[in-house]
A protein has these predicted regions:
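A local structural motif
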Residues: 58-62, 85-118, 130-133, 186, ...
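Short coil/turn segments
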Residues: 67-71, 161, 170-174, 188-196, ...
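Pocket-lining segment of extracytoplasmic ligand-binding domains
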Residues: 142, 217-222, 227-269
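Pocket-flanking alpha-helical
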Residues: 73-81, 94-154, 165-178, 197-201, ...
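Extracytoplasmic "Venus flytrap"
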Residues: 54, 61-83, 117
Length: 269
């Protein structure tokens, strides 16, 4: 599952410091253009890609460090891989030709690396500063701000407009509860130590520090064993499906609340 700080993040380079305030998050999906590019423009772009023009200006491979296991939230990046990709399971990475529009060879390769457990739970900025060959990295707004004093990064793209970070629970254990603030005061909230949003939730009185257990490692065993009798971090685009469809020993819907809807509006992937 994600992280899930996990649990999603703008892609960043390792240049100048980021802003110290979070960017606003749109609550609706961005409009999709209804017209196509002019034929001559598309042809020119395809010709440039076919000539491998990026080889003259880009490193190869272009290394992208993600913030978690390979998952749907990273889909746009994995879509850049050509059909010749090779998975290196021992190093939690995949490498292949970088293609544009799913078919145009750009002349360089792309290597995508997993984060989270694969990097010892380090923040992406920390990993990037240890390895200068990393070209881009997934990080959240709050993660970038947190690391900005010693490891500044520049945000260059946003993958999702609304943060899918959630806290979830079994609705059978907490009938009628729809928000985290409605959970009993002694309900444990299980997260990873990278979950920086927790400090805000505690500061706002949404959860109490005594409830927080920073021991989440993306497994399903505890949630299954305790039948979801506590709050746990996740992604709306990930864990609900995993627990209901891919975890037969649980096999039912979870209830959750987005941290965005709690008022914590940041970019994440």
């Amino acid at each position: 599952g994600s992280d899930d700080d996990d649990d999603a993040a703008p892609v960043a380079t390792t240049a100048a410091p980021v802003a110290t305030t979070a960017a606003p998050v749109a609550t609706t999906a961005a409009p999709v253009a209804t017209t196509t590019a002019p034929a001559d423009e598309s042809a020119a772009e395809e010709a440039a890609g076919a000539d491998g023009v990026l080889a003259a200006v880009c490193p190869s491979p272009i290394i992208v460090q993600t913030d978690w296991h390979a998952q749907a939230e990273h889909g746009p990046t994995y879509e850049l891989l050509g059909q010749d990709y090779v998975i290196d399971a021992s190093n939690y990475s995949v490498t292949g030709t970088l293609v544009a529009s799913g078919e145009v060879d750009t002349g360089v390769d792309i290597e995508i690396r997993e984060g989270g457990p694969a990097t010892g739970w380090q923040q992406t900025a920390s990993v990037m500063y240890q390895d200068p060959d990393i070209f881009l990295g997934y990080t959240s707004t709050d993660g970038a701000v947190e690391a900005s004093a010693d490891q500044p990064t520049v945000s260059v793209a946003v993958i999702m407009e609304k943060n899918p970070q959630i806290i979830m629970w079994n609705p059978e254990q907490f009938p009628g509860v729809e928000r985290v603030t409605d959970l009993p005061d002694d309900t444990p909230i299980l997260t990873s130590w990278m979950a920086t949003y927790l400090y805000w939730l505690i500061n706002q009185g949404i959860v109490d520090a005594s409830q927080v257990e920073e021991s989440y490692e993306a497994g399903v065993s505890r949630f299954v064993a305790e039948d979801g009798a506590y709050g746990q971090q996740g992604y709306a685009s990930n864990e609900p499906y995993i627990y209901e469809v891919e975890t037969p020993e649980y096999g039912k819907a979870v209830q959750y609340e987005l941290t965005h809807d709690m008022g914590y509006e940041t970019y994440s992937q």
